[in-house]
Structure formats: C-alpha cells, structure tokens
Amino acid sequence: MLSIGSLCLSLGTTPKPLKPSKTPKPIRKLYATKAMAGSNPKQVSTFEFRDLMETFAVDVKRAENRPLNVPLIAPFTIASSRLDKVENVAIRIELSDGCVGWGEAPILPFVTAEDQSTAMIKAREACELLKNSSSMKLGLVLERVSEILPGHEFASVRAGVEMALIDAVAKSINVPLWILFGGASDSITTDITIPIVSSAEAAELASKYRKQGFQTLKLKVGKNLKEDIEVLQAIRAVHPDCLFILDANEGYKPEEAIEVLEELHKMGVTPILFEQPVHRDDWEGLGHVTHIAKGKYGVSVAADESCRSLVDAKRIIKGNLADVINIKLAKVGVVGGLEIIEEARTSGLDLMIGGMVETRLAMGFAGHLAAGFGCFKFIDLDTPLLLSEDPVLEGYEVSGAVYKFTDAQGHAGFLDWDNVL
C-alpha cells in the first residue's frame, strides 16, 4: 500500500513521531505559504514538500463526484482493449477558505482496475470521508485517502481525489502546480498517439499531425505483426522525419517483439522507445526484450503495465528489466507517482509520463507535474486531443504539440459543474 510515510522516506525524511533521516534528500521545493496568498509565486521563499504535508491544515467544506462522459473523435483501439467513449469520474473538492480543487479518475477497461460504476461508488466514499473529517494536515488527509482507496485496485479514483485536494491546496497558497512541483519549466512538448487502425487511416492521421507540428508519433501495435509493419511503412511515407514510439500494450510474445525490431531495422527505422512489448507479468520476457532491443538495435524499452506500484518499480530496477518507467497517475496515484519518480531518479532509470484517455483536468495535472519536475525524457499526454468535445474551461494553453502553463493557481482547469450530469 502506498503511504505518506513511504513518500516521506523517499523524500529523505520520516513522518512524526519517527526521527528524521540524517541525510535528507528533498525531492522538490514548493513555493509560498497560506500567509503569502496574493504574492507573486515566483518571488517568494521556498520550503520542502514534506513541510507542506506536515504544516498545511486541510479543512474540506464540500466534496462530490459526478460522471464525466465525453465522446471520442474515433474509437480508440489498442492491443488490449477498445474505447468508444470516455466514461471517467470528475471530483470537486471545496475547502473552508473557498478554494476549489478539481480532479479526474480516468477509466480505461483492462488497464485501470475500476469501471465507471465502481469508481463512482469509491469516489463517493472518499468524498464522504473528507466532508465528515475535521481539519487535519495534508499528509494525514492523503494517507486517509490511500487507506480507503488502496493499491492498484482503486488507483485511478485515488489519483482523482489526490488531484482535487492538491489543486485546492495550491490555490489556497496561491501557486500554479508547475511551481508547486519544482518550477523547472512552464511548458511541455507531447507526442501524439495513432491507435490501431488501417494503414490508410494511419497515414492520414500522420499527415495531419505533421501539419500540426507533432514530431513524435506514438504508434499502437501488438494485435497483428504483419499489419503493424504495414502501418509503420505507411506512416513513414507521409511523415519521413518523425520520431517513433511503439506501444504494444502487452500485445507481443518476446520473439514477436524482437521480430518487429528486426523488420524495422531492415527498413532503416529505429524507434526512440518500445513500450510494454510483452504481458505485464512476463518479467523474464520483458528483461529479454530489453536486453536485445538495447544491445542489438539501440532501442530503449519502457515498462508501463508492468509497473503498477513502487514494488514493481523496484523489481524492474533491481533486475534491469527495462530502461524506462512510464508513470501514469491513474495506475499509481499522485503520491505513488512521486515515490516512483524518486526511486527511478535515484537509480538512474529514465522516466516517461503518460495517461489514460482523459480530459484536460487529469492531463493538465500530469502536465504541470511533468513541467515542474523537468525530469521526464518522454512525454505522452495527448489524449484530450482525441476527444470530440472539451468540457474543461480555462486550464493550460495548447499550440500543436506544446502545452503552456500559466501563472494561474493550481492547474487552472475547471468544469461547469451544473452541466456535469
């Protein structure tokens, strides 16, 4: 189970009443205090993340959740599932000082453990807990949320609640999230995903994305090896200078994954990343593909579905089973994501940040985190671009592949709550 205690340990400190570490390693600095509200967040002094959790008192006035249903431009097909519309859960938390935080629990069948109905029930339980709790420190609130929404089983809902809480706190101390997470940058550049489609459709999408300024295409593969190669050839013809990420979503056997790399090698194509080539529980196969991909073809392999907890991350690191870990908040929660970031950075493993099929609420939170930390080699935060409607008001600014984050408090996105039914 992820806990605030384990997070504090990863930050180089321990929760009271335990003695603090002798060699603290703060993960990030945060800006401002509640007393500094209204000041310029770029000009205020800093204090450590653990201090915010230990000193900021959270007093929840209202907390509620509603279904967040949004149509897609086209069905989103990957090796393990097909999504025809987004059926997520929106979460709204209001503090006693009037600051409102927004979160989203993304649901992707066969990837997240929850479906929408389960997520609604568990989110409601968490909201009731928050409403009925007395004022307590942020760290304790997050720990209580983790207890009622434990492990990977409820990670997506936990992430949504954590997002809303942290967004509200950021607004209360008058800082944007990218500053809260370290302030490394106020923008990111994302790839864009081409789902499993025909070679003609893939070529059409690649041509469109090229005109929109996307230099990195993430191609979903893993259902049919021959068709995957044909799609790659079609994309290469219309976007010859693009960088490729292959994402098999567990779809290949180890020998098939290596065969794909061999065929691409013959075409003169080297992907910059090969994501989750084999089944999540095929640890031996993952390590084998990673060794061959890097040693023979110079291709890095990322663990996505195989990394659903800090325990998984440690296993991957110890066994040299992948070159990159893909952090998705819906898999591990926000607190869990921070734990894995610290573990990976300490070990020298590269990091990727991704998401499920989400609106700009969840994607905005993840984008702020990525910009603030500045430590992600691969950024895959594109799925709001696949939606036919955008229910989120304000938030980050989009210019092709670039997301720009402003100085607005929190992640700055919100919903017209009366129209979220």
UniProtKB/Swiss-Prot annotation:
GO biological process terms held by the UniProt record: peptide metabolic process
Enzyme Commission code(s) on record: 5.1.1.-
Residues that hold Mg(2+) according to the record: D247, E275, D304
Xref: SUPFAM superfamilies: Enolase C-terminal domain-like (SSF51604), Enolase N-terminal domain-like (SSF54826)
Origin: domain of life: Eukaryota
InterPro entries to which the protein is assigned, alphabetical: Dipeptide_epimerase, Enolase-like_C_sf, Enolase-like_N, Enolase_C-like, Mandelate_racemase_C, Mandelate_racemase_N_dom
Cofactor binding notes: Binds 1 Mg(2+) ion per subunit.
Enzyme class: isomerase
GO MF entries: magnesium ion binding; racemase and epimerase activity; racemase and epimerase activity, acting on amino acids and derivatives
Keywords: Isomerase, Magnesium, Metal-binding
Cofactors, names only: Mg(2+)
Entry binding sites for substrate: T193, K218, L219, K220, K328, D380, L381, D382
Record's function text: Catalyzes the epimerization of various hydrophobic and polar dipeptides. Has epimerase activity with L-Ala-L-Ala, L-Ala-L-Ser, L-Ala-L-Thr and L-Ala-L-Trp (in vitro).
Family: Belongs to the mandelate racemase/muconate lactonizing enzyme family.
Note: Part of a large, functionally divergent protein family. Protein modeling and substrate docking were used to predict the substrate specificity, prior to biochemical analysis.
Name of the protein described by the UniProt record: L-Ala-D/L-amino acid epimerase
